[in-house]
Amino acid sequence: MKNFLFCLSILLSNSIYSCDCGVETVVNKFAHSTFVAKGKIIKNYNNLKGENIYKADIEIKDLYKGSKVKSVFVYGRSDNKIGTSCDIFIPEGTELILYAHKDKFNRLIIGMCSGLLYLNRKTYYSKEKKTRELKMLKSLSKLKEKDINKVKLYSSELSDSLATLKGVDSKKKYGVYKLKFSKKLKLKDIKTVDGFTEKSIDKRVKRILTNTTWELLKDRDSVKLESNYNYFIDIYHYPKDKKNKSFYTKFNL
């Protein structure tokens, strides 16, 4: 639990004091990206004239969403100098998970707030986090539904509800669930997409999700849900250590 709070505090402090990125789940990062892949930066180019964007050639190792491309554009500076607080520079040879979206010029853009996960650089992220995220993306890439989680949902109760699973162990580190809502945000159905090894844990997680109150994350007055709106959610299990019991959370730490 201490590791969870430490990592969460770092994520939140980064979003508050640097680039205001916020914290996203893996499912939402996948859902709101045009292109998702495990890849490697093989060549960087000079910044485009008058823009804080530079081109980078990539080598795709695994493609999870979108079409194969040979390059992306990075929001930052290729000379690695300080620009804005959101500027980044990714050295050649860096292996990472790329989450990209298209800008108004139809360019695939990655940046500080894209949800990038570096795989061969020293970061405060654990090896287990990287492994979980790669496995999760492989699972999400197999979904029949491609246009998911268009409207983000939120529950202030979920963290406390998942705390009731503290001390319950699982051989698997994550589960994915599909929630179906009415236009009025009433939960109609819930299914296991890629569950935990133990069916008993899936049942308890689904019971928690069923008894949770959900609301729109933003634009509550202007956003209207479609009938039978499907929302996918990822839940993670962290095993016990010497001082703490195992626990479950919606964050991949």
Predicted features and spans:
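Transition segments tied to proteolytic processing and entry into folded domains
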Residues: 16-176, 226, 236-244, 249-253
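A short acidic/small-residue loop/turn micro-motif
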Residues: 163-165, 193-200
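Short tight loops/turns at secondary-structure junctions
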Residues: 171-197, 209
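Short, positively biased Gly/Pro-containing turn/loop motifs at secondary-structure boundaries
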Residues: 203-253
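Sec-dependent N-terminal signal peptides
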Residues: 4-13
